[in-house]
């Protein structure tokens, strides 16, 4: 059994003991207050509220000289089981310590991770005692693996990895042979690239590179590679160095410099020039994945938009690189999703669909099936688990048939796509990239501790297990923001929340993931700039759409597309667009607007969510629909609000953002948590001032007061006042609105474009593919551990999820596991 503290054993215990000795009465009063409330869990805001209520201001000033206030502010939760109070303390992102205070004796003890989790389990099972509880611990497999120690290094994994491994691998001539072997074995569909068999030693490589460089320097810079390729073959060099003499010279020099004086930047630049990625498979099984008429359907939103924009940018970058590398290879990208025979007016029943705006990218749809048949209908993303093992095998077969080759990179999306990506990458030995989009454990508070309460509706035991498998199996993980990995000073990151947690009665995660792991890289997406562009670019504006946009916003009649109306069309508009579910918190926006009379005087509210034309099958959406109607009726919002059904037309949505900007309105994103916030980027790219949740990605996208504003959805009254203040200032001074609009645009151009994204992603794929080849980066030991965890734990959990009822005869097929 594991028996370790996560970091810095004793330090907090010693400091707390000293503080208790110096301020016994004050702290006894506080901890007694905690215990008096009885058994339970206290959140950070509750701890600070009690601290301010119990300790007088003068005494709090005295305590500031010690460490207690810092410890309390760093506490992410307190578990109270009288007479004990246990604290989970997070001094900085990614670093955790655990202590327990006996209030009766004022004694402090340090807890190991298993001890803390076992104590926490007593909130559920009453005793926390078990003869044996499975503990999941990945730390021993990574103990000898390098990782940074500074929080600022989190999310910059490839830079750290290059620094460390370049110094390790290139410390002498002999250690460079893995690079030589990598270049010699590099090929595509049996055709050699970079080097041929004429070069067998490093000395021969350097000599050939120098002779080749002398030769190309004698040629005009624009001489095509085809004119001198035969000469290069004689020197032991094959295609892949460049398309003309100038580029070949640059790339030859990169490798010569690397062999002479290795450094991480030169290494990354050189690896970025090697042709490595030609076939990409992107997995996104759940929901309705199509190019039209699906946005707003259950489980269908930002992830679909993200992937469609992603593949267009990736294909462009792949084509550019292949051309610059002097190759005649056609790249392929396959977006693999679920085929839905009951396609309900979409193309989701079509096996193969070309992606518009691309030449070589397709959506490949593969159905869910069991021995009872093919599943015809849509099912929630929370119910997909029993289908994924068979699905992974079916997808592998379909992909092999389509590509006639093994993919070079597999990218998973969300929990289901990442699990299927893990199964496929494990079987094929392919580089795997994980993109979470959202990890559900952080969206539903205490859904780990009280997982049994959520199990019937959400099956979180399967999902959390799948997430742990995927994040530990991946070669690299990309996130849109730092917060997604490690949160902020005050909030825990999505991945960080998987460091240590418990599913009582199932297993304890002693060490689930390390946010300092160099597999983490921040690669932020952008908006499609052919659709989303500033409202000031008059020559590009789609004015032909204005009549239907005006009808959408202001028509006095109601329809299946919009309900309620706006009396005063001259007011600016608060605009929001999202799925209608609890986390997106659209009803929270309506409520904060409804409760602020001054805000209602200043502006109208337009929300785009849900579907008035059909009854929802989604339980959360049903509850939010009911709440929305109730708020509109209670606060008599008709005349102030326009409620529009989910809009499928992205082109019109882009012009809708700009039309709202014409009214000098704003965009509000009120989610309780948002992993990234594509709509935030879209609105800012259109020049629309944006107010967005402070919980998650938008807190990084927006610089508060410069390129937009942060709002706290848990404090709707303060968010409403912030909006009132903005509109009142803008009413008095037009330049105030303009300043935020321009600040948002500047921020986008600096950090959030698909061009930057695609360049970075393909470079990462090459770098991690190289390191996987030349080092132990494939983490074989971890993957064997994962095979056992998958077979003994995940598989049984998946079987416990009820199958949907419908189908037709299916063809028998082999079942794939992590060990196959």
Curated annotation (Swiss-Prot):
Enzyme class: transferase
Top-level lineage group: Eukaryota
Positions of transmembrane segments: none
EC number(s) given by UniProt: 2.4.1.13
Region (GT-B glycosyltransferase): 276-753
Keywords associated with the record: Glycosyltransferase, Transferase
Reactions that this protein is recorded to catalyse: an NDP-alpha-D-glucose + D-fructose = a ribonucleoside 5'-diphosphate + sucrose + H(+)
GO molecular function: sucrose synthase activity
Biological-process GO terms, alphabetical: sucrose metabolic process
Described purpose of this protein according to its UniProt entry: Sucrose-cleaving enzyme that provides UDP-glucose and fructose for various metabolic pathways.
Similarity annotation: Belongs to the glycosyltransferase 1 family. Plant sucrose synthase subfamily.
Record-given protein name: Sucrose synthase 2
High-level lineage: Eukaryota, Viridiplantae, Streptophyta, Embryophyta, Tracheophyta
């Amino acid at each position: 059994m594991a028996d370790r503290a996560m970091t810095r054993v004793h330090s907090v215990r010693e400091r707390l003991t000293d503080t208790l000795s110096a301020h016994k009465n004050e702290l006894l009063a506080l901890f007694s207050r905690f215990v008096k409330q009885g058994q339970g869990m206290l959140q950070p805001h509750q701890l600070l509220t009690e601290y301010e209520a119990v300790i007088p201001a003068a005494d709090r000033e005295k305590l500031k000289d010690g460490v207690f206030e810092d410890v309390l502010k760093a506490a992410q939760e307190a578990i109270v089981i009288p007479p004990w109070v246990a604290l989970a303390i997070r001094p900085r992102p990614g670093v955790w310590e655990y202590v327990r205070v006996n209030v009766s004796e004022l004694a402090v003890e340090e807890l190991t991770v298993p001890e803390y989790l076992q104590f926490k389990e007593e909130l559920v099972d009453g005793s926390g005692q078990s003869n044996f509880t499975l503990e999941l611990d990945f730390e021993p497999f990574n103990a000898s693996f390098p990782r940074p120690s500074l929080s600022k290094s989190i999310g910059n994994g490839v830079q750290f990895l290059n620094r460390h491994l370049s110094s390790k691998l290139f410390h002498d001539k002999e250690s460079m042979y893995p690079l030589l072997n990598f270049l010699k074995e590099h090929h595509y569909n049996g055709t050699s690239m970079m080097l041929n068999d004429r070069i067998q030693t490093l000395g021969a490589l350097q000599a050939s590179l120098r002779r080749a460089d002398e030769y190309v320097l004698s040629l005009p810079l624009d001489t095509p590679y085809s004119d001198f390729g035969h000469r290069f073959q004689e020197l032991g060099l094959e295609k892949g160095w460049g398309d003309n003499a100038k580029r070949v010279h640059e790339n030859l020099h990169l490798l010569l410099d690397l062999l002479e004086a290795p450094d991480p930047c030169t290494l990354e630049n050189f690896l970025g020039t090697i042709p490595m990625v030609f076939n990409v498979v992107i997995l996104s099984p759940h929901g309705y994945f199509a190019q039209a008429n699906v946005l707003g359907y259950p489980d269908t939103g930002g992830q679909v938009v993200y992937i469609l924009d992603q593949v267009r940018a990736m294909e462009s970058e792949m084509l550019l690189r292949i051309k610059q590398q002097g190759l005649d290879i056609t790249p392929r990208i396959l977006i693999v999703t679920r085929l839905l025979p009951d396609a309900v007016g979409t193309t989701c029943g079509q096996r193969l669909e070309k992606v518009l705006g691309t030449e070589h990218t397709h959506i490949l749809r593969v159905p869910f099936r069991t021995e009872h048949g093919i599943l015809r209908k849509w099912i929630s993303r929370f119910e997909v688990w029993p289908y994924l093992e068979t699905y992974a095998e079916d997808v592998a077969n379909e992909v092999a048939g389509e590509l006639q080759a093994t993919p070079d990179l597999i990218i998973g999306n969300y929990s289901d796509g990442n699990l299927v990506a893990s199964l496929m990458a494990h079987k094929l030995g392919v580089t795997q990239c994980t993109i979470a989009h959202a990890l559900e454990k952080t969206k539903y508070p205490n859904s780990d501790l009280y997982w049994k309460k959520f199990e019937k509706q959400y099956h979180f035991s399967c999902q959390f297990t799948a997430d742990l498998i995927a994040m530990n199996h991946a070669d690299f993980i990309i996130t849109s923001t730092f917060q997604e990995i490690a949160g902020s000073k005050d909030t825990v990151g999505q991945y960080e929340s998987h460091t240590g947690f418990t599913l009582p009665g199932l297993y304890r995660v002693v060490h689930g993931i390390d946010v300092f792991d160099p597999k983490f890289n921040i690669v932020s997406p952008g908006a499609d700039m052919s659709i989303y562009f500033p409202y000031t670019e008059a020559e590009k504006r789609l004015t032909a759409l204005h009549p239907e946009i005006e009808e959408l916003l202001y028509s006095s009649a109601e329809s299946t597309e919009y309900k309620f109306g706006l009396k005063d069309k001259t007011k600016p508009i608060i605009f929001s667009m999202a799925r209608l579910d609890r986390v997106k918190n659209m009803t929270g926006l309506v409520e904060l607007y409804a409760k602020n009379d001054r805000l209602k005087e200043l502006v109208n509210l337009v929300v785009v969510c849900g579907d008035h034309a059909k009854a929802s099958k989604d339980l959360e959406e049903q509850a939010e629909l009911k709440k929305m109607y109730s708020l509109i009726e209670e606060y008599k919002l008709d005349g102030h609000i326009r409620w529009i059904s989910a809009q499928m037309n992205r082109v019109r949505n882009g012009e809708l953002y700009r039309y709202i900007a014409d009214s000098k309105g704003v965009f509000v994103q009120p989610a309780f948590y948002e992993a990234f916030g594509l709509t935030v980027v879209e609105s800012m790219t259109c020049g629309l001032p944006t107010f967005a949740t402070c919980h998650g990605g938008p807190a990084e996208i927006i610089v508060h007061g410069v390129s937009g504003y942060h709002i706290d959805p848990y404090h709707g009254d303060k968010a409403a006042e912030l909006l009132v203040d903005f509109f009142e200032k803008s009413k008095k001074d037009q330049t105030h609105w303009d300043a935020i609009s321009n600040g948002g645009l500047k921020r986008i151009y600096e950090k959030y474009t698909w061009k930057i994204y695609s360049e970075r992603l393909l470079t990462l794929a090459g770098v991690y593919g190289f390191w996987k080849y030349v080092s132990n980066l494939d983490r074989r030991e971890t993957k064997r551990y994962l095979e056992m965890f998958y077979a003994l734990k995940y598989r049984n959990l998946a079987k416990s999820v009820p199958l949907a009822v419908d189908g037709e005869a299916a063809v028998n097929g082999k079942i794939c596991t992590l060990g196959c």
